[in-house]
Every structure is written in structure tokens, then in C-alpha cells.
Amino acid sequence: MPEGTCYKLSPSELTFLYNSCKHCFVLKVRHGISQPSIPLPGIFSTIANLQKDYFADKRTEDFLPELPSGKVEYGEKRIKSDVISFSDFPATCYIQGRFDVVLSLDDGTWLVGDFKTGRSAPEKTEMYGRQLHAYAYSLENNAGDFLSLGPVTRLGLIYYTPADCDMNENIFNLKGGLEWNEVPLDMENFQGFLKDVLTLLEGPLPNPSEDCNWCNFRALTQNVEGASKGLPEIPTCPDCGGAMAKRNGKNGSFWGCRAYPKCYGTLNI
């Protein structure tokens, strides 16, 4: 790997893809090879959007008293961190994504939250915590003109669990309660996790996971007569000689240097 590679990390990939399959995670982040996308049922997006509209500017005591005193300040905004580096490690990274909700607390600090639909799952707190820490880090260490907030002192998940329904004047109502699951804030541990991620990305490609459906699919198709073997060839950057990743732009797909934004080399596909 060329020295100085700068990886783009999304909060969702650090949470779900990293947790489910290291092989697919490295393929995505290092090589730009994504798992085939499967659209989520639209109802979840509808519920999330309705929640964000309803909670906008509301005081916490008016909808979930377990929350610290404050009000909903921001809903769904894009974030991007400054470049993250470690003194004893050549590779760097940055975080880019979109948070669900941020609350301004009465003590002058900020709370970063995420809406979930379904029963609360305390056993997944650590996994979801990566996503929330990624948002918090990016807000406190923003790049350029992206949103800057701090200090972030609280993180957590707001669960909506449907439990009952009724009909009133031809309007069908789905009812349920809200539950607050706080995530312990530990930015030092999160930065250590990011260094582990960079170590993984700079190392050899992990073996396919036995419990990953996409890894199993690739293995099965490679056994079909006439199937091509191995990963597609990754070109080298015409400007710096480093590896490239497949990216999507307004005019379609192209090869972009993985050292971006330090290098702007591109190739047509």
C-alpha cells in the first residue's frame, strides 16, 4: 500500500459492514467494491421522516422525560471530519455521513442521537456506539464548512416500538412508546478503534466470512464453469502511482485515487 493513503469512512459502514464482514468491509473501503444494494422497505424511511418532523424544536420533557433537559436543534444533516492521523501510522482517514438528530442541552453541551424503529437491543449498544461516536467526532473536528458543534457530552438511541393500533374517523393509528438507551461516551476508545480499522485496511485482505451471504455467493459463483477468478484488476493512479477505488460522480462511475484529497488522479472506466 502506498504511504499516505487517506480512507473515506462512513458511520454506517463502521457500524454495520465492519461488524458483519471484515472481508466485505475492506473490499468496499479499500477497493471501492460494494455489496449489491438491497433497498430497505420504504415504511422505515417514512416513519423516520415523520419522527424528525414531529420532534423538530421540541423540548425533551415534552416527549421523553428520561432525556437530559434541552431541545431538538438539528435533524438529519451532513457531516465530515477533518483528516484523522496517528503519529506512528502512515495511513489516514476521514469520516463523512449524515446524522439523525442533535439536541442542544441546557448546560450548553450537545447530545447526538439516532432514531431506531423496533424493540430496544442493549446488546447492540457497542455496535451502534461506533456510529454515534463517528457523528460526535466529526461535529467536534469538522472539515471546512461542515457543521461544527461541541462539546458533545451525551450519546444515545431513541427507540420507537409499535405496540397497539386503533381507528378513529377512518384514520388508522399505529401507537407505541419511546425508549432512551444511552451510549457511554468514550472518544479515546473510539480513536483506538479507528486505528484498528486503518491497520485492517493496510493489511492483507481478510478471508471471506463463513456467515456472510455475499462471501458465500461469490464462492459459489466461482465454482461455476467459465466463471472468472479473483478480484477485478485495480488500476494504479496516473498521478502518484497509488491504488485507485471505483467511485460514482454526477457523470457516472470512474476510478479515483485512494489518496484523495491529497491526490486528485482519476481514470475513466
What does each of the following model-derived ranges do?
Residues 28, 219-222, 244-247, 264:
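Cys/His-rich zinc-coordinating "finger/knuckle" motifs
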Residues 261-269:
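Short metal-binding segments enriched for Cys and/or His
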Residues 212, 237-240, 257:
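Short cysteine-rich clusters marking metal-coordination/redox-active sites
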Residues 1-105, 109, 119:
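Metal-dependent nuclease catalytic cores that hydrolyze phosphodiester bonds in DNA/RNA
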Residues 85-193:
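Mg2+/Mn2+-dependent nuclease catalytic core
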Residues 232-233, 237-245:
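Acidic/negatively charged segments and metal-coordination signatures
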Residues 1-13, 142-234:
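Metal-dependent nuclease catalytic regions and adjoining charged, substrate-binding loops involved
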Residues 247-256:
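Short linker/helix segments within small regulatory modules
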